[in-house]
Amino acid sequence: MVAFWTCRNAWFQHLPFAKRGDENAPSGPRRLRPWFLVLALGLAACSEDKSAPQQAAPLPPIPVGVIKITERPTHPQLSFVGRVEATDSVDLIARVDGFLDKRTFTEGQAVKTGDLLFVLQKDALQAALDAAQANLAKAQADADNLKLQTERARSLYKQKTVSQAMLDDRVAAEKQALAVVQQAQASLEQAQINLGYTDIRAPFSGRIGMANFSVGALVGPSSGPLATIVSQDPIYVTFPVSDKTILDLTEGGRTATDRSNVAVSLTLSNGMTYPQTGAIDFTGIKINPNTDTLMVRAQFPNPNNVLIDGQYVQVTAASKHPVEALLVPQKAIMTDQSGNYVLAVGEDNKVIQRQITQGSTFGSNVVVKSGLAVGDQVVVDGLQRIRPGQKVDPQIVDATTPAQKAMSVGN
């Protein structure tokens, strides 16, 4: 409004009738009509000049932190949920019927191979052994007698005083007696074995659990386990590996079941790292159709009995030998309807969106299988302030910053 009145006053100062005392100025409507037209045109021009919009100054490029993509030697690692399993586990079962006479261990204690654990009453089985010994002695005596009779019959047959039929009967009777001796010998051995079964010993070293029967209970093969023993050192950890992971591991000619290239470590349920490293000693031969996984087993030393049969642990399998890969921090990866993408800096420092294909994830990084190349600049800081097509001021993140350190996982 002020500009309008300033312009108006300037025009009025140049009008002839604005000067007082001009004797030659025309008077009346005839004198004013041309000058009103000039005045209107001048005011319109003044108004148009002042109302023209002013162009805004361009915004400066937004500073962002970027990393330059390079191939880095990394030790890829994968995590799985595993279960601890004893290398040996056995239920102690009485192999003969009898009353439990003794229990010689403390529940939960460590035992060694051959330690005596349970004793069954021996009386009945000892009596059976004595009877078997007597039967064997009788059978042996009968056999000896028939042997003498057979020898006498042969002598008489040579003298033609007995018939061939009688000799044959004596030979057959001797053979039957020898068979009875063998049968009695077998019965004696079985009685000795049964008597030996009354002493139940540890088949291997480990730890024994709770006793399921008290002293005096009648036990036998059908009564169930007396107790359970599990070995503890070394110990197994089994974990399933998905079909997809196996395919990822076999890319580039690698072998998914190459045990020599894998170091295995454990994280316990309290977050602590198990101090011993393990090695894969078995891989399954087929995929489980119900879970699409392959079972893998690793063996670990367990000198302090930290690992317990049935325990859940986190298994980390890492490559012993470095692998060249393009790595991007997870925080730089975003997702839309087309999949995963990153924001990169292109020509003229303008932001471009790059769709990527992810590979294995380990640490705080992701392997990029496609979509990026060596030398590309990927935005890692300031992602919330930019969009594709916007001009930015890329600032390389220094190698000592956390973002760049994330690219060196496994080195």
Swiss-Prot record:
Keyword Oxidoreductase: no
Molecular function as annotated in GO: transmembrane transporter activity
UniProt keyword list: Coiled coil, Periplasm, Transport
Cell compartments where the protein resides: Periplasm
GO biological process entries: response to antibiotic
KW Coiled coil (keyword) present: yes
Gene Ontology annotations for the cellular component aspect, listed alphabetically: periplasmic space; plasma membrane
Induction line: Induced in the absence of BepD and BepE.
Coiled coil: 118-196
InterPro entries according to UniProt: CusB_D23, MFP_Efflux, RND_pump_MFP
Pfam family, one: HlyD_D23
Family per similarity comment: Belongs to the membrane fusion protein (MFP) (TC 8.A.1) family.
Quaternary structure note: Probably part of a tripartite efflux pump, which is composed of an outer membrane efflux protein, an inner membrane protein and a protein that expands the periplasmic space. Could form a tripartite pump with BepC and BepG.
Biological function: May contribute to resistance to some drugs, such as deoxycholate, sodium dodecyl sulfate and nalidixic acid, in the absence of BepD and BepE.
PANTHER family (UniProt xref): ACRA/E-RELATED COMPONENT OF DRUG EFFLUX TRANSPORTER, MULTIDRUG EFFLUX PUMP SUBUNIT ACRA-RELATED
Protein name: Efflux pump periplasmic linker BepF
Gene: bepF
